[in-house]
Amino acid sequence: MHALGRTLALMLLIFITILVPESSCSVKGREEIPPDDSFPFSDDNIFPDGVGVTMEIEIITPVSVQIGIKAQLFCHPSPSKEATLRIWEITPRDWPSCRLPYRAELQQISKKICTERGTTRVPAHHQSSDLPIKSMALKHDGHYSCRIETTDGIFQERHSIQVPGENRTVVCEAIASKPAMQILWTPDEDCVTKSKSHNDTMIVRSKCHREKNNGHSVFCFISHLTDNWILSMEQNRGTTSILPSLLSILYVKLAVTVLIVGFAFFQKRNYFSSRDLVFMKERRSKRSVWQREALG
């Protein structure tokens, strides 16, 4: 019955919000890099074999762009007027890379070469080598490189775009009778768990910061002497409350407890009723014997 009392005292509150990692800065500078097979644009159909080229790379400090605004990424003119090919390489943080070739003879960005949907779309018959983004979203967070092939060499300009979103935090809180509950996370990242005592109850609160919002579920494991719980939450749904589910569990346990207590009460009542009945029969039997003895 003591364990049942602890179960009745159990209350769980769990909620989830979303957190995006802080912005970071890269170094600005220029350097020469020889051609490498591992470079994403070293395709034979774009750069013929045996051609010695010089790479000039300019790394731009990351730019923070708010969600929902319109953006335009510029591909600056090359030192030479003989720019025959320009290619945008888009590498979102949570998507595979995508290429957008700009053909000088066509004066428009050709059909994109992508391995996954969800990347930047270019309007049909776009007459500029600049890359427009109609409405910035979290999926546009990543690196954008404009690569130019000229008679003087190959030039590349890089943009690092950061799209801050809402806070991405997962919190699991449990309130129960002593001893304190144990809370574990999967996956376990940057988590801090604190507990405090209030009268005969213990409040345990665990908070985890997620560096990436990949949409995968986060599991909170809650362990107590009375029972164990496994709660699943999805990061990409924003604020989520599973209190109705927990209330359903508590209602079921309360109903079971009431049935057990009621059954025990009726059993005890039947026991005392039977004992009283036997006692009354014995008293009546003894009284009859006394009356017979008195008459005899």
Swiss-Prot record:
Keywords: Disulfide bond, Glycoprotein, Immunoglobulin domain, Membrane, Repeat, Signal, Transmembrane, Transmembrane helix. Disulfide bonds join C75-C146, C172-C220. GO terms for molecular function: signaling receptor activity. GO terms for cellular component: external side of plasma membrane. Expressed in uterus and bone marrow-derived mast cells (at protein level). Expressed in uterus, spleen, bone marrow-derived dendritic, basophil and mast cells. Expressed in the lung of N.brasiliensis-infected mice. Weakly expressed in brain, testis, lung and thymus. It is found in: Membrane. GO terms for biological process: regulation of neuroinflammatory response. Residues 26-245 are extracellular. The chain crosses the membrane at residues 246-266. Residues 267-296 are cytoplasmic. Residues 48-162 form the Ig-like V-type domain. Residues 1-25 form the signal peptide. Residues 151-232 form the Ig-like C2-type domain. Coiled coil: none annotated. It is a single-pass type I membrane protein. Glycans are attached at N167, N199. InterPro entries: CD200R, Ig-like_dom, Ig-like_fold. Its main location: membrane. According to PubMed:15187158 isoform 4 is a receptor for the CD200 cell surface glycoprotein. According to PubMed:16081818 isoform 4 is not a receptor for the CD200/OX2 cell surface glycoprotein. Isoform 1, isoform 2 and isoform 3 are involved in the recruitment or surface expression of the TYROBP receptor. Isoform 6, isoform 7 and isoform 8 are not involved in the recruitment or surface expression of the TYROBP receptor. Isoform 3 interacts with TYROBP. Isoform 8 does not interact with TYROBP. Belongs to the CD200R family. This is Cell surface glycoprotein CD200 receptor 3. It comes from Mus musculus (Mouse).
